[in-house]
């Protein structure tokens, strides 16, 4: 039977989801963070779902982009990029701007468009898979593994958000010293079975973070460890940390900011360097690889424009002998399912992927994805293998509607100023 894959409707639902007080070099996570849920409906009544960033700058592009999709085929994945190029980007969103957290370098119109396209591409793949009775990984060429390994994503963390700030309670407790970090790692292991650990650094002086990693190495001997200060260190400091931790680190992630600084660090240490900051588009690959600045690229389908571009990135990395794994920002189950499907198709995935998912107490799915032994099983159900919980989606959307605009754009520095009114985003290198 021929299926009618014509897109008849696209629904965009911005939401606010609870986020714990996780610390980074920019500040602290807000009590709620914005996400955008994308739904694509076909003439046959099939609905596909996707997820991406929900900040205003992405919504401004997603709305006109969604209108252009109606009447097109859900299978026209290449056409998504052509359509995205037709959507104008407000120059104030990109001129001289650095994205929140500085995680992608200088913001560009193309980077904004790719993040929007990623959510729609996943939704189209989900719908196409459901229509054909095939899982997304089959549409991507087939899986090479039945489960994808993830690492425990450790953060320095306050016990609660500042007093007087509306927020959801969590049971993780505080982690502001080596003992707290180790306790957090043990909790991750007990709950989810993780066997590798990543610590978000750039929060405290390097000596304190070195002590935390050494404490992890003592508590979990032989387990892969990573440290990520988000470019907060100078080249000199990066080299000192690498010398101190070289015998326990799997890799050091973005110790210094930018490709030239990373290349200088890489030239003077044997510790592999990973990045999700200086290689976030195809245009940034040549300089980084030519200069030997990175040994592992942490892909993120929200950055790169979707799952198929993620596969292309993995192929380029394989060609140049550069490792590949996956970066994570705050996300829900739709994105974790998408990550798992594409990760299952990448042959040379030699490092556990990152995921914030354990930190998110809320979701929009009828059933949360589960970690078993630190891994997520690859679904063989049609599409992504997930289903929306309409009541939860409506609840989280209502929270977004009720917000006065304060939380509709992620701003870790603004969240920190609630606790410390004198806080300013630190200049880099911070140490």
From Swiss-Prot:
Task: Extract the CDD domains matched here.
Answer: D-glucarate_dehydratase
> Which keywords does the record carry?
Lyase, Magnesium, Metal-binding
Where does this protein hold substrate? 29, 108, 153, 198, 228-230, 276, 327-329, 356, 410
Gene3D superfamilies named among the record's database cross-references: Enolase-like C-terminal domain, Enolase-like, N-terminal domain
Q: Where is the active site?
A: 200, 327
What Enzyme Commission number(s) apply to this enzyme?
4.2.1.40
Residues that coordinate or bind Mg(2+): 228, 276
According to UniProt, the reaction catalysed is:
D-glucarate = 5-dehydro-4-deoxy-D-glucarate + H2O
Q: What is this protein called?
A: Probable glucarate dehydratase
Q: What gene name is given for the protein in this entry? A: gudD
Its function, per the record, reads:
Catalyzes the dehydration of glucarate to 5-keto-4-deoxy-D-glucarate (5-kdGluc).
Q: What is one Gene Ontology biological process annotated in the Swiss-Prot or TrEMBL record?
A: D-glucarate catabolic process
Species annotation: Streptomyces coelicolor (strain ATCC BAA-471 / A3(2) / M145)
Q: Which Pfam families match?
A: MR_MLE_C, MR_MLE_N
